[in-house]
């Protein structure tokens, strides 16, 4: 059994999350509230919400944790070709925080293999939009001919970014947004993007798992640092379109 949290109850230590032998590895707690203060506290502890309509708010801290180090981002030859085309063609834009709620709604509506419905409920959209208004959640959006065709959103504290979801209505549109974000974070010296759980898609882009203990320790350090600027555009992609496409790893603990 996982603990039920009343509004003033603190999170239990993440080490108490359910283990791999259970049906819900990483599940830590449940609650009825998704207040911004609760959400902020969760991220700073390496915890995130994930639940469906009709369920209580379920809080997770899996071990291991999937992350993407910007320095280890893999740019395939086909993606590099796409990014070069985006840089050349004025019809392509990458905008930051232009339509945050719209990106969230598009992510909610995007079909997911093996999933029915969405975990991005109206309650989730309201909570993360509140974080966006306070400067702690951002959207990176791919636009073509004046229409938003893909993007992603996530949470940011200090020098830590927590990726949440992405969508694409055009081929590679979400990858364009992710690549632009990665290029900006590399330029700012950020070492880690939280990806929460392992997927083959993330692994193909350079994502890997690290121990929860190492992840939480990194979050505590990075989130306490001054925030980075969140003004950039597709010109950041120039750093990824050279022959190498990836910088040397910066030594994140595994």
UniProtKB/Swiss-Prot annotation:
Its EC number(s): 2.3.2.6
Classification via InterPro entries: Acyl_CoA_acyltransferase (IPR016181), Leu/Phe-tRNA_Trfase (IPR004616), Leu/Phe-tRNA_Trfase_C (IPR042203), Leu/Phe-tRNA_Trfase_N (IPR042221)
Subcellular location: Cytoplasm
GO CC field: cytoplasm
Catalytic activity: N-terminal L-lysyl-[protein] + L-leucyl-tRNA(Leu) = N-terminal L-leucyl-L-lysyl-[protein] + tRNA(Leu) + H(+); N-terminal L-arginyl-[protein] + L-leucyl-tRNA(Leu) = N-terminal L-leucyl-L-arginyl-[protein] + tRNA(Leu) + H(+); L-phenylalanyl-tRNA(Phe) + an N-terminal L-alpha-aminoacyl-[protein] = an N-terminal L-phenylalanyl-L-alpha-aminoacyl-[protein] + tRNA(Phe)
Origin superkingdom: Bacteria
GO molecular function: leucyl-tRNA--protein transferase activity
Alphabetic keyword roster: Acyltransferase, Cytoplasm, Transferase
GO biological process: protein catabolic process
Function: Functions in the N-end rule pathway of protein degradation where it conjugates Leu, Phe and, less efficiently, Met from aminoacyl-tRNAs to the N-termini of proteins containing an N-terminal arginine or lysine.
NCBIfam families: aat (TIGR00667)
Homology family: Belongs to the L/F-transferase family.
Protein name: Leucyl/phenylalanyl-tRNA--protein transferase
């Amino acid at each position: 059994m996982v603990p039920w949290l009343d509004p003033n109850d603190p999170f239990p230590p993440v080490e108490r999350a359910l283990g791999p032998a259970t049906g819900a590895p990483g599940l830590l707690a449940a609650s009825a509230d998704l207040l911004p203060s609760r959400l902020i506290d969760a991220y700073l502890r390496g915890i995130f919400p994930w639940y469906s309509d009709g369920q209580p708010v379920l809080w997770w801290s899996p071990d291991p944790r999937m992350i993407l180090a910007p320095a280890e981002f893999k740019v395939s030859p086909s993606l590099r070709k796409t990014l070069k085309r985006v840089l050349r063609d004025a019809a392509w834009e990458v905008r930051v925080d232009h339509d945050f709620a719209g990106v969230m709604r598009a992510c909610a509506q995007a079909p997911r293999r093996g999933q029915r419905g969405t975990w991005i409920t109206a309650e989730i959209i309201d909570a993360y939009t509140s974080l966006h208004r306070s400067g702690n959640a951002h959207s990176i959006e791919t636009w073509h001919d004046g229409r938003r065709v893909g993007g992603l959103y996530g949470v940011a504290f200090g020098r830590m970014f927590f990726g949440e979801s992405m969508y694409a209505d055009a081929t590679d549109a979400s990858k364009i947004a992710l690549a632009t974000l990665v290029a900006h974070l590399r330029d700012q010296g950020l070492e880690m993007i939280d990806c929460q759980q392992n997927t083959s898609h993330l692994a193909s882009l350079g994502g890997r798992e690290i121990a929860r203990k190492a992840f939480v320790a990194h979050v505590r350090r990075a989130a306490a640092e001054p925030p980075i600027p969140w003004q950039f555009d597709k010109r950041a992609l120039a750093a990824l379109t050279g022959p190498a496409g990836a910088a040397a790893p910066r030594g994140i603990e595994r």
